């Protein structure tokens, strides 16, 4: 039996004082919110596919994520950040070669045909969420824990599914899939599809900047550049992290499930990505002052009590996973093949939710006014994580210190499962990635105080940091302070994002195009 837990990202606890009183923000303690309870429906619109409104493209871009091992399963949210392959290929107009045709060609031609059927989607999410991905076939160093040790068997990922609230679009007979009511095939449901193979880690936001954090006994702490030769006795040195990561999800188009994901979900996501500005314009790089008066839009899949159904499309055991081509041998077939089933759950379900008020239909939210919080790390709804000593995270059994700037979203209490949701501004640009909410534990029942946290992905230079931490960083394209960023992987794999960097005249995305 699997014990089910859901992550909101980080639940931020503050013992001993009440939020928005005149107490220091240093009192907040981040804790991964692995909870065996689920959230209740909030005031936002849910279980409705957005059409012809501000959220429509965000929906197309966004997916629910599900990792399962021997003991637990975890839910989160992710969004398409990049891809590799021919996104114009319409499987509805193509016929993939039959096995009889394939068997008649040479081994070399067979390899080319099979490799041509691979499309790779890159899905952005939170670092703390992909801590649940433990895959022996992952890229180094992610195929082992942070100490170079193999993962215990009961922690290894057994299955991975992508999800979306949508129509199942299944033509099989109901009795073949254990359906109770045939009409459910025509209804929107929370659809999860198991991919043919386990994903890999394309990028993990660990140690991305040229700075380290030195933890002191009085919790003040300080940052230094890595090149510093100074000795700091009675301190513990932690590398930095940003709560941002990218999954590599291979889709083999001769596999029915992978082909369905590509055709029905990824192709619309690619179209939305391009309509939102493609690589040149989708990633905001906004001066801090412009954050204050903006509006923020959030769409994700928090786990809540839900009266909808869940449809799980498991892997077909008949699919032959060939180990004989250079591409296929680098991926691991899913160890646990899920059953195909239509179920009604009473223990919570990922729920499509976006921050449009159900009653007033007001869309989006503002940053919180934090004038009442007396801490120099905060100002006008922005937060400097570098100066908050307790914001740490264990990824693959190694502890890291959070750095960077973030947004504090007012009236945003998306519960577990919303980790990794993209936060857009009113210009429909991606500004940050949602990773958790603030919790007040002084009441004894861990009351959510309706404030959500995002990690800004790209920043301008600023001189307002009081902690000797980097004043700018860019987790997508890199800058003078960022030594590990996603575009490095994109260059290595020659993805869509890298091709755009190569041809773009937009200097803000080409800073590192000629660098390793």
Swiss-Prot record:
Lipidated positions (S-diacylglycerol cysteine) are 23
- Give the residue numbers of the N-palmitoyl cysteine lipid attachment: 23
InterPro entries linked to this entry: Mycoplasma_peptidase_DUF31 (IPR022382), Uncharacterised_MG067 (IPR022381)
Subcellular location, record wording: Cell membrane
* One Pfam family named in its UniProt record: Mycop_pep_DUF31
Q: How does it sit in the membrane?
A: Lipid-anchor
Which stretch is the leader sequence? 1-22
Question: What's a single GO CC term here?
Answer: plasma membrane
Q: Which UniProt keywords apply?
A: Cell membrane, Lipoprotein, Membrane, Palmitate, Signal
The UniProt entry, under PROSITE patterns, shows:
PROKAR_LIPOPROTEIN
Q: Reply yes or no: does the keyword Lipoprotein apply.
A: yes
Family of this protein: Belongs to the MG067/MG068/MG395 family.
Q: How is this protein named in the record?
A: Uncharacterized lipoprotein MG067
What organism is recorded for this protein?
Mycoplasma genitalium (strain ATCC 33530 / DSM 19775 / NCTC 10195 / G37)
